[in-house]
Amino acid sequence: KLLTDNDIPTLNEINNIMETIQQNNDEKAFLILSLAVKCALTNTEICSLNKEYIVINSNDEMYINYPPKGNNRISRIIKVPDDVAVLLDRYICNNNIIEGAIFINKRKTRIKLRDTERLLEKYCKLNIEKGMLNNKFTMQTLRHAAICYMLSGGASKDLVASYAGITTKWITRYDKIINSDTYKQAVDYSIISINA
């Protein structure tokens, strides 16, 4: 299915949601949504994130190294943007996470997919009530937005597909959006960058 402009939140809408989260001092929600928007992580990847998957290279750059799973047996390595790396490091320190799940729920167990969707829904509703948002978005639409902004920012389809952990055949579903006037004008090259 080709995606349209209406399927993807704009930078202003994402910004409004993030500002509302900051105003509510919700460090966990801010980090979760940052991982979706700036790293194009899936909801499943966010919920399954373990401390052991986080690595720092010799240049002090943070990466997430998801172990191989499924039939392809290929690990996925994601470069974490510096601003998100600071948030993630602070969250780990503030919550004294030594090992295991990065995100836990109120029951002190690993956060579930529905928990993250509820977090996002809560802040979408607050923005709808303030007239700052027209539609609710899902974790998947935030990931779609991340991919669209990378493509709009000039990253190659192959590089974006590799970073997002998908095949290039799936990238064509974003063509209509990145070629629309809305995204040509709205793209903010600083929101997401990919270094080859």
Label each residue range with its predicted role.
Residues K1-N16, R107:
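Flexible interdomain linker/hinge and immediately adjacent N-terminus
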Residues L11-L41:
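Basic, Lys/Arg- and aromatic-enriched nucleic-acid-binding interface segment
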Residues I14, K28-F30, L113, E117, ...:
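Short, leucine-enriched amphipathic alpha-helices that occur as contiguous helical runs
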Residues L35-S48, G153-A155, A164:
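A short, glycine-centered helix-capping/turn motif at helix boundaries
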Residues S48-V84:
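Conserved tyrosine-mediated DNA breakage-rejoining catalytic core shared by Y-recombinases
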Residues G70-D89, G100-K122:
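C-terminal catalytic core of Y-nucleophile DNA break-rejoin enzymes
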Residues E121-S162, I166:
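Short, basic (Lys/Arg/His-rich) helix/loop patches that form interaction surfaces
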Residues R173-A196:
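DNA/chromatin major-groove-contacting recognition/catalytic segments
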